[in-house]
Every structure is written in C-alpha cells, then in structure tokens.
Amino acid sequence: MGDTEIVPLRVQNVLDSEIIRLNLWSMKFNATSFKLEGFVRNEEGTMMQKVCSEFICRRFTSTLLFDVSGRFFDLVGQIDREYQQKMGMPSRIIDEFSNGIPENWADLIYSCMSANQRSALRPIQQAPKEPIRTRTEPIVTLADETELTGGCQKNSENEKERNRREREEQQTKERERRLEEEKQRRDAEAEAERRRKEEEELEEANYTLRAPKSQNGEPITPIRFTRGHDNGGAKKVFIFEQTPVRKQGPIASSTPQQKQRLADGANNQIPPTQKSQDSVQAVQPPPPRPAARNAQFASDADLFAVPKAPPSKSVRNLAASNVDIFADVDSVLDTFHFESTPGRVRKPGRRNVSSPSPEPRHRSSSRDGYEQSRYSQRYEHDNSRWSRHNATYRRHEDESRMSRKRSIVRDDFEYSRRHDDGARRRDYYDADIQGDSKRYRGRDASSSSGRSVRFEEEHRRHGDEYRDPRGPRDYNDYGRRRNHANSRSGEDEEKLNAIVRREKELRNRLQKSQKASSSSYRHRSNSSDAEESLNEWDIENQELLDNSMMFGDGIPKRSNARKDKFVKKQATRSKPANSTKSPAQARKKKRASLEDNRDLNDSIACNRPRRSCVTPVAKKITWRKQDLDRLKRVIALKKPSASDADWTEVLRLLAKEGVVEPEVVRQIAITRLKWVEPEQNEEVLKQVEEVEQKRRRGAVARVKENVKMHEELREGGNHRAEDLQSGVESMEDYQPEDVAADQSLLALRTPIVTKKRGGTRASIMPKPVEDSPMSRGNNSTFNSPRLEQTKAKDIETNFKYVQHLSMMQARPSSRLKKSSSMNNSTYRGNKNTSISLEKGTQKALKIINRGTTIHEDDENEDNDDDDDMREEDTSIY
C-alpha cells in the first residue's frame, strides 16, 4: 500500500472529532479572542440546552470553527441579533455576521471595541499541537496550514515510520481482540451444549409422568367436563372428590434430589437394593453434577406417577437390572402419602324407565365423538346424530307422504329399515354416561323432524298395540315377524283402526274444550260463532303445519317475528228449505256441522302440502325520464282526447312494460307531464261523432234497410208473395257488394238442432270495440293489432250475419199495411222496434253460439234468455 494513499493520523483524529451544530448562536469577545454560545437539543430531544465553546483558535469556513478544546462548531442557524445588540454590537457589524464568520472578523471585532479594549487587544494565538482530550487512543491535532498545503513536506520519514508502527500495533490489538471474542463464543456454545446434555440425562433419569404443577402453592383446580347444552341438561363431572392437600413426606426415589443424596452417601442410610444399583452404575463415568436445588417432596404431580424402566445405555446384567427396577417401583409406591384417596363423583342411578325407542342402544359408544361432532363439524360427520345417508332421499320421501294421493302404508313403516336407509341417523340420542343411559331426549328438543315426534308420541301412548313387549327391540326383526304373522287384510284393518282411534281422541279433545266454554257459547250469535271458530281453526291448522314434516330434518321453525296474517273466511249460508225449524234445532245443527268441519279441517291440515313458493309481489312500475319523453312524443303525435280509444292507442304505441291499462297512462300524463284535455267546439264534436257512426259496423246496412223499407211503404201493395210466407228475405234482394249480405248461413237456412244447455268460454263471440274499426275480444289472438286476413274475414262474416238477423227482427211484424199516410216515426221505428232490435241481437248470438231455435211465442223463455245473456255479458252494442 503506497504512502500517498495514507491520510495523516492527525487528520484522521480531527475528522473523528465531535461536531456541534448551533441553530441560534451568539459571540462573546474580549481582548484576546471570542467565544461562541448557542443552543442544541438534549439526547432525549425534549428540551434545548445551552452550549459554550472555548476560545476559537481556527476558522475553516464561514460556518465551521475549531476551538482550543478540540471541538468543531457548525453554524447552521442565524446569529442572535437581540442578544448581540444588548451586548453593545452595532447593527452594521451584526449584518456582517449574518451568514457566518467572515474572513475579516478580527477587524470587525476590533472596530466594535472601545479605546481601553483596543489597548489591551492582543493577537489570537494558534492552537497547541496536541490539545488535551479525554480519549484513550493517541490523538493529534490538525496539521499546520503549511503542512496541509505543502503536500510532500508534511510527511517526513520519522512521521511515516511512526504511523506505520501505530498501524501495526492497532492491527495486532484488533486481531487479539477478535481471537478473544471467538474463544469466548466457543466456550459459551460448549457450555450450552453441556447443559443441554445434562438436562436430557436428568429427564431420562426422572421417568415420572407428571401433571401440570400448580403455581405459587395454590391448590389444584379440579378438571370439569360439561355435557349437553349450556342452558339445559348440562352437568359438571369433577375428577377429584376433594382437592388433594400437599403434605411433606419422604423424598421419592425417582426424584433427582434423592438420587443426588444416594450418590453423596453422607448422613443417609442407603438400602442394599440401591447400593447394588449404584455399584452396577459405578462402571460408567458419573454424569456432571446438576446445580443444587431445594429439597422436593411428593407433590400433586406425583399422584399420577407411573414408573417405567429407564432406557439402557450400556450392557447390564439382566437379573440385576430387573431387581433394581422392581425395588425402585416399591420404593416409589411406599413413599406416597395421601390424605384421602381421590375418587370420581357418581350420580345415583336413575329409576329403571324403559326407553321409548325400540331401537337398541349403543352403550359402548363414547361421548367424545359426540362432543367432537357437536362442536366442530355438526352437519358434516357421517357418524353424528344429525347426519343422514341421503338428504335428498329423505326430503323426497317427506314430500311424497305429504302429497294429496294417499296410500295405505304399514303401521310400522317408520320403524322398519328401508332399502337405502342403513346409515340413517337414529331418532333418539345415544346413551349418556353412567347413571344416564335411560335418559330420554325427544327429537323435538333438537332440530329434528316433526314426523318422528308424532310417531314417538304414539308409541309412548299405545306401545302395547304396536308390538309385543316380549318381542325383539330391533326394527328389522319386529317388522319381519309382523309381516309373517299378519296378512295384508289384517294390516289394513289395523291401519284403519289406528286412524279411527286418532279421530276419536281428537273429537273427545274438542268436546272437552267446548264444554268449558258452553255457557258463554249460548249467548253468542251464529255469525260470531262461525267467524271465531273459523279463525281459531285457521290458527290451529297453521300450528299443525308448522310442526309437520315439511319443517323437519334440520329446517328450523318459522320465527315469531313474522307471523302469517289469517284472513277471515266469510261463512256462506244457504236458505233453509224448511223455515218452520226452531232456533234451538238450527243452532244444534250448526254446532254439529261446525264440529264436523273442525274434524275435517284437522285431518286435512295434518296432511296438507305446503306451498312451494310465495305469491310474488307485484313489480313496481317506475317511470324514468326516457319513458316520460316517449310518452310526450306519442301524445304530441296522436293528440289524444279524453276518450278511452285514444289512450288505448297511446298505450299501444308506448309499449311500456307492465302497463296494461290506458287510464294509468292518462293519469301519468296528467300528473307528470301536466297534460290538459283539449277543448273542442260542438260542431267539431258533432262531425267526429258522425264519422264514428259511419265507421261502425252495420251502419251502411242499416241505412240501406231504412231506405228500402221507406220505398216499399210508399209503393203500397206491390210486394212479393214470398214476403208473406217467410219473414226472412232471400239473397236476390241484396247485391253481392252489399255489406249486409250473407254468403253461407242465410242462403242455406239455419238447421234446427236440439237445444244444448250451457256452453264453453271458447264459444262466446268476442265483444267488438265500439270506437275501433277492428274488433278485439277476450281471446289472445284478437288482442293482437295485426290479424291474419282469414281470421278478420271470418269475424266480419259472423258479425254481418248477426247484424242482418237483428235488422230482420227490427222490422214491423206485418208488411200488409201499405198506407201512404204513415208518419216518420212509423218507418224509423218506435219503442217496440228498439226492443225487438236488442232481443234480435241476443237471439242471433244464441243461434251462433248454441245452435238453438228462436221461439217467439214464449215470453218467459225470452226473459230467461235475457237474464242469461246479461250474466254472460256478451252484448255487442
């Protein structure tokens, strides 16, 4: 390494010196030099503390100064103007020191001094070569300015040699220090390894199984096990009948303290068995002696001591080792002292109650699996109480049992094994621990199905009728013996008997409940009795449905927060055939019918299927801005009036989803768009009405018919002979292009067929819209704005036929009176003529729909037909 790359030692030491940075500083000067004062933060950074320098001996830069004590001062802040003015420094001089100490600082300070201070002023002396510093290593000050600038002159031969020796000494010291640290590290690792081996040997020698020790001499808290739920059915089983009490006794031979005493052999009588054991072990080198500890007596942990043979580390005499092991076991067992023997609390046995379930108990099953399956994964364990082989199979089975189609099943269907039900869960809990094996837990206490609860209650009430008490308790054996013993007819009879018995029980229960309220029941009216009974049975039916099979197998019951609203049923009454019955008899009959209805409702409610879905809520129609803009454009295009026909057309053009009524669109236009009905003149309205009348069906035919009737009346007796014989005119009287002409039924005459009672909805003609040229009925095909030509033609033909028949019936009954003196009311039609027009329309519809003949002479039948037609609401006009 070349000498040119070596920095002088004095420079290195100066660079390692302390640098103090002053944020706010001031100057104190005298005749010799000046000192710096400032404030720096303390080591904690919580407060500022004042720092004063020694006499400044060197200026490196305007902000870096060096004092005689060997400290550097970095002026990072500003000068304290107020303090300097207070000390008598003029402002112009303070401005010169605003950016640090200038090069002419001595002249500036000299100009500030008084005459006396100037006479005593002496030049600033240079700092000594090596200032005294509290450092352990040799430190030299900075070189002189001549040496720093000279380059080659500052490094003399002696100085180089001295620097080399110092570097070698430092390297030697550093090498020795590293070797010492490495040696200490290796010794520490060896000591840690030795301690670890000692602890392992002690653990192998101390082969006692120990329970967790109590801290600070407190008694051991007994371990508690909790069974069942936290609220109900939980009980605590304590391991100890009472807390064991520590008692000082002889030291156990398995403890390390006793082994240490045996090894020492001082002031102790060593048994011969232990002496022989020590003599055998004397061949091996003794293990390192552990640290001395206090004597350890038999504690709570020794209650669980189970001695075992320590692992052999060397070849021993087998007979001698066996003797030593047994002697050690005897010594351990002889040295234990108990105040009382720990015992387990056993609850007194429950009374011998027969289990309600005919399924055999598994008394050997532990409760640990139950606890684990209950608290870790409740529904995923196949062996737990809640698991089942196939949830879908059980659910479909419940749905099939709840369907309307009832099938007679064996009475023991629930208790017989099905083909795919081998791994199905049991209907009852497993047997509990001692003294609790006969405990019954109904499935209604857990999230189980109501089906098993219902059958279990039947077994509890009528167990003798279902099985032989001396018979087997297994389901399969019981089902096989029953199938072999009884025939199919016997099973059906027993099933019916069970149903009858349940109905009798229900009837008795209802009668008991009615007797309690019989006194107040007599004073009530029949209507209130009917309503209250219906409401009561609606509530009970709902409860039965909630407890039925559909809410079982893990499905929780409905919460009480949302209860169904029961609608009161209106009791429909028919007029009594015999009005001479007394009120008491009527009330008695009413009670009997109510009782029958209750029985029927109960039997139906037990097996009524649940609705698979709820009635969907009507979708709320929202009118957005784009919908309102479209409606605005349609209204501007169509300019509708207040008529329904105009708004129907607006609704069709708008095609808003969910809107089917034109009144809704009209109200939206009024409320949201501020639409106002346009005002029209009477003349314009009359013209529109005339145009509408001309557009209506049959208007042209009616005008032609009136003209022809007027001409015939004016001609007199020039009528044809066939007009006297037939009330229906022939096809010759009409031109082919006439709207009122018929092409099929009128020419061929309507065939007379037998009268049919009733009719279907499909046979009713669609009702035409009066203001629309196109007819629309209830059928979906007629609601379409675009109809096929064939359908439109058929509809037009049918209506032509109806209008023609109505006009034929509207004529005067006799055409023989050909007087020319008839007034206008004669041929225009009077009151009777208008009545016959309505009747003719209705009868024409009857002919088309039902194929019936017209009997004009039967007035009663006409009245009945009028009533029927009003009920069917098939009138055209």
UniProtKB/Swiss-Prot annotation:
Coiled-coil positions: 153-211, 491-549
Regions of compositional bias (Basic and acidic residues) in chain numbering: 156-199, 359-385, 394-444, 453-480, 592-601
Pfam families: Knl-2-like_dom (PF21506), SANTA (PF09133)
Region (Disordered): 122-315, 338-535, 549-604, 757-785, 808-877
GO biological process terms, semicolon-separated: cell division; chromosome segregation; meiotic cell cycle
Effect of loss of the gene: RNAi-mediated knockdown results in absence of hcp-3, hcp-4, knl-1, bub-1 and lin-53 at kinetochores. Also causes defects in chromosome condensation and aberrant meiotic and mitotic chromosome segregation.
Keyword Cell cycle listed: yes
Domain Myb-like stretches: 617-678
Main location: nucleus
Location in the cell: Nucleus; Chromosome, Centromere; Chromosome, Centromere, Kinetochore
Phosphoprotein in keyword set: no
Record field: compositional bias (Low complexity): 511-520
UniProt cross-references to InterPro entries, sorted A to Z: Knl-2-like_dom (IPR048553), Knl-2_Myb-like_DNA-bd_sf (IPR044895), KNL2-like (IPR039110), SANTA (IPR015216)
Bias type Acidic residues, positions: 856-871
Bias (Polar residues) ranges: 251-279, 573-583, 775-785, 819-836
Positions of the SANTA domain: 20-107
UniProt entry keywords in alphabetical sequence: Cell cycle, Cell division, Centromere, Chromosome, Chromosome partition, Coiled coil, Kinetochore, Meiosis, Mitosis, Nucleus
GO cellular component: chromosome, centromeric region; kinetochore; nucleus
Function recorded in the entry: Required for the recruitment of hcp-3, hcp-4, knl-1, bub-1 and lin-53 to kinetochores, kinetochore assembly, chromosome condensation and chromosome segregation in meiosis and mitosis.
Subunit and interaction comment: Interacts with hcp-3.
Family affiliation: Belongs to the KNL2 family.
Designated name of the protein: Kinetochore null protein 2
